[in-house]
């Protein structure tokens, strides 16, 4: 049995979006054989009341939380101009979190410190300084450099997005350096897919192995529609897109589909069968760029759903 300290960017319960889903099920899997301590940021509406996070409490020997640090546009601009780090390296950098991490490392002998996501990668420096014997696992939830590069290419296609493209161009260079450093500084690197592994391997010039740990969910924990007794009040849609709708790749995907594909689907189906077509965009926190889709015939932007 190993003693593992896991660092997460938000409390991974309830697991309601990609990051928290991955982190919760990683914790659940590791807890079967190892002793888990969790240090997590706590978002504004998250609760640490025992009844609210009972499944997470059952998996962890100890849970510590720190509020997400406030960060406004002025702070982001200052960091952009006065440092060489990428925006993501500043997003969750917190003196309170660093103090709590330092305390946990000083008070305990952790075999492994597992860092979930690039926003927390600067913690590597603290682990090296305070607990040099601890092995560091860096779980790179996205191949962030490649993701930002694709954002840049997407924005370059639209003159109205050229300011965003300029920002992305700066971030690509900074992320390349930072992500390479984080991967090289860790004792082990994990990612979510073979495609991400190839991107990270290229970034590292294949000097360090990258292990794929796919995302997973417990399908038995979700009620199937077949179990519902009354279907009469359920809305039905021909097409459904599900995802966290303030996540940039999801926003870009939905807008592209709406502009390039959706009109053709509606027209062809109406011409061939006389049927109208409906499309639901399902997911929490819809970005402001999606507002224009609410006016499209047949399109529903739901926001959060149970």
Question: Over which residues does each language-model region extend?
Answer:
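Acidic anion/phosphate-binding donor-loop and adjacent secondary structure
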Residues: 149-150, 201, 217-233, 291
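Active-site proximal beta-strand in glycosyltransferases
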Residues: 2-4, 129-160
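N-terminal subdomain of nucleotide-sugar transferases
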Residues: 1-64, 108, 272
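A short beta-strand/loop micro-motif in the catalytic core of glycosyltransferases
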Residues: 37, 113-114, 184-193
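Carbohydrate-associated surface elements
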Residues: 195, 216
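Conserved donor-binding/catalytic core segment of Leloir-type glycosyltransferases
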Residues: 5, 231-254, 258, 262
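Nucleotide-activated donor-binding/catalytic signature segment of Leloir-type glycosyltransferases, i.e.
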Residues: 268-306
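Conserved nucleotide-sugar donor-binding subdomain of glycosyltransferases
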Residues: 68-122, 126, 162-185
């Amino acid at each position: 049995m190993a003693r593992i300290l896991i660092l997460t960017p938000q409390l991974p319960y309830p697991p309601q979006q990609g990051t928290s889903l991955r982190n919760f099920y990683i914790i659940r899997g590791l807890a079967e054989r190892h002793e888990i301590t969790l240090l997590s940021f706590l978002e504004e509406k998250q609760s640490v009341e025992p009844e609210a996070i009972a499944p997470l409490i059952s998996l962890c020997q100890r849970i510590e939380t720190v509020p997400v640090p406030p960060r406004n546009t002025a702070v982001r601009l200052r960091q952009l101009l006065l440092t060489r780090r990428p925006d993501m390296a500043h997003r969750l950098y917190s003196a309170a979190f660093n103090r709590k991490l330092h305390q946990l490392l000083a008070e305990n002998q952790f075999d492994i410190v597992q860092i979930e996501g690039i926003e927390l990668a600067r913690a590597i420096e603290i682990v090296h300084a305070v607990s040099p014997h601890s092995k560091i696992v860096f779980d790179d939830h996205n191949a962030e450099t490649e993701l930002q590069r694709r954002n840049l290419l997407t924005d370059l296609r639209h003159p109205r997005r050229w300011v965003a493209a300029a920002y992305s161009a700066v971030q690509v260079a900074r992320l390349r350096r930072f992500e390479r450093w984080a991967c090289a500084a860790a004792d082990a690197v994990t990612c979510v897919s073979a495609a991400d592994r190839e991107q990270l391997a290229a970034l590292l010039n294949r000097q360090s192995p990258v292990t794929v740990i796919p995302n997973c969910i417990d399908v038995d924990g979700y009620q199937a529609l077949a179990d519902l007794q009354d279907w009469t009040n359920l809305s039905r849609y021909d097409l459904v897109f599900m995802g966290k709708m303030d996540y940039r790749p999801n926003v870009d995907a939905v807008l592209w589909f709406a502009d390039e594909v959706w009109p053709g689907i509606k027209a062809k189906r109406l011409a061939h069968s006389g049927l109208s077509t409906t499309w639901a965009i399902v997911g929490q926190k819809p970005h402001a760029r999606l507002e224009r889709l609410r006016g499209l015939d047949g399109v529903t932007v739901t926001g959060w759903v149970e």
